[in-house]
């Protein structure tokens, strides 16, 4: 038995096919979803989506949003998403270093909050690459 996973951003469909299992980062922690999972709607945190296709695991960096699960269908609507295999490791590492530098230079609450979010997004992209290796 399989699940139909659809990952959408405001601009594109990132993923739309059948999967065996997923592990999703929510605001209350990670949840594993197998076929016949109880119906839920949940907020999606900035984090990694792990997708199992047969015996292979793939990763995707998600940038926050919402997910609806029911009737073996999972719809994930996020601000942005990138497959781990599509992320350039050097560019992701440079972005992480820039985000760390920007956080140390942040002045005031707003800049600190924005810098922290940028750092979380950058770390998630690097983590998506590292989970593939």
Swiss-Prot record:
<comment type="subunit">
    <text>F-type ATPases have 2 components, CF(1) - the catalytic core - and CF(0) - the membrane proton channel. CF(1) has five subunits: alpha(3), beta(3), gamma(1), delta(1), epsilon(1). CF(0) has three main subunits: a, b and c.</text>
</comment>
<protein>
    <recommendedName>
        <fullName>ATP synthase epsilon chain, chloroplastic</fullName>
    </recommendedName>
</protein>
<comment type="similarity">
    <text>Belongs to the ATPase epsilon chain family.</text>
</comment>
<keyword id="KW-0150">Chloroplast</keyword>
<keyword id="KW-0793">Thylakoid</keyword>
<dbReference type="GO" id="GO:0046933">
    <property type="term" value="F:proton-transporting ATP synthase activity, rotational mechanism"/>
</dbReference>
<dbReference type="GO" id="GO:0009535">
    <property type="term" value="C:chloroplast thylakoid membrane"/>
</dbReference>
<dbReference type="GO" id="GO:0045259">
    <property type="term" value="C:proton-transporting ATP synthase complex"/>
</dbReference>
<dbReference type="GO" id="GO:0005524">
    <property type="term" value="F:ATP binding"/>
</dbReference>
<keyword id="KW-0813">Transport</keyword>
<keyword id="KW-0406">Ion transport</keyword>
<dbReference type="Pfam" id="PF02823">
    <property type="entry name" value="ATP-synt_DE_N"/>
</dbReference>
<keyword id="KW-0066">ATP synthesis</keyword>
<dbReference type="Pfam" id="PF00401">
    <property type="entry name" value="ATP-synt_DE"/>
</dbReference>
<keyword id="KW-0375">Hydrogen ion transport</keyword>
<comment type="function">
    <text>Produces ATP from ADP in the presence of a proton gradient across the membrane.</text>
</comment>
<keyword id="KW-0139">CF(1)</keyword>
<keyword id="KW-0934">Plastid</keyword>
<keyword id="KW-0472">Membrane</keyword>
<dbReference type="InterPro" id="IPR036771">
    <property type="entry name" value="ATPsynth_dsu/esu_N"/>
</dbReference>
<dbReference type="InterPro" id="IPR020547">
    <property type="entry name" value="ATP_synth_F1_esu_C"/>
</dbReference>
<dbReference type="InterPro" id="IPR020546">
    <property type="entry name" value="ATP_synth_F1_dsu/esu_N"/>
</dbReference>
<dbReference type="InterPro" id="IPR001469">
    <property type="entry name" value="ATP_synth_F1_dsu/esu"/>
</dbReference>
């Amino acid at each position: 038995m399989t699940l139909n996973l659809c990952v959408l951003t405001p601009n594109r469909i990132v993923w739309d096919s059948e999967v065996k299992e997923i592990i999703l980062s929510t605001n209350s922690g990670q949840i594993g979803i197998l076929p016949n999972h109880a119906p839920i709607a949940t907020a999606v945190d900035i984090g990694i989506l792990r997708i199992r296709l047969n015996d292979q695991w793939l990763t995707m960096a998600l940038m926050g949003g919402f997910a609806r699960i029911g009737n073996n269908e999972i719809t994930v609507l996020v601000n942005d998403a990138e497959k781990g295999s599509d992320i350039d490791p050097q560019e992701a590492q440079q972005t992480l270093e820039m985000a760390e530098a920007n956080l140390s230079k942040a002045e005031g609450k707003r800049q600190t909050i924005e810098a922290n979010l940028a750092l979380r997004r950058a770390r998630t992209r690097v983590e998506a690459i590292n989970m593939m290796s």
